[in-house]
């Protein structure tokens, strides 16, 4: 369980308009947990957004792939984020450089209060590939998918790419939020 509270506690970032509770790999992680150029990696995990889950209209990230090193390391390469809207939605965001675009999105309601299994496959490199599939665990039905066989998945000066999971959300519209407990399970990182 990843707990997040709307009232101030110790889950603030350097910027006080946002908060995070995440796990991630980092430079001291074993090499097989770090994405490197010309490598294909499969990330798998399960997660559940609880009944009544409330997203920020700004961002509520639940997963990111982020470069370490180089001038673009502050901008995530891929982001799964939920967003308050009409209707609320799940978005897959991508940034080749320092500008993010939405690659795909779906209504959030069918993803609430169900266990989901995610399979994300990425080939890191300037001639990269990316595929993500989110299925409902109870019946294996596909809730979200996206695939691209010609996408840039490496940044100049990057040392490696690290995955992140948890809750990272904006507090700019805190009135739209509540205390949350996001559930994750069965993390897997496999090099092919």
Question: Which sequence ranges carry the predicted segments?
Answer:
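Low-complexity, Ser/Thr/Pro/Gly-rich disordered linker/stalk regions
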Residues: 1-116, 122-192
């Amino acid at each position: 369980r990843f707990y997040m509270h709307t009232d101030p506690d110790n889950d603030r970032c350097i910027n006080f308009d946002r908060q995070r509770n995440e796990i991630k790999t980092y430079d001291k992680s074993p090499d097989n947990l770090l994405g490197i150029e010309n490598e294909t990696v499969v990330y798998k995990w399960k997660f559940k957004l609880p009944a009544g889950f409330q997203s920020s209209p700004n961002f509520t990230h639940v997963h990111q792939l982020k470069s370490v090193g180089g001038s673009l390391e502050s901008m995530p390469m891929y982001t799964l984020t939920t967003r308050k809207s009409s209707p609320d939605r799940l978005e897959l965001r991508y940034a080749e450089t320092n500008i993010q675009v939405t690659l795909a999105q779906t209504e959030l309601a069918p993803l609430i209060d169900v266990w989901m299994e995610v399979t994300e496959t990425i080939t890191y490199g300037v001639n990269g590939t990316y595929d993500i599939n989110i299925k409902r665990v109870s019946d294996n039905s596909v809730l979200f998918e996206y695939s691209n066989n010609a996408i840039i998945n490496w940044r100049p000066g990057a040392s490696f790419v690290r995955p992140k999971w948890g809750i990272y959300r904006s507090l700019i519209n805190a009135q739209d939020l509540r205390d949350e407990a996001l559930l994750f399970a069965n993390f897997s990182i496999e090099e092919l």
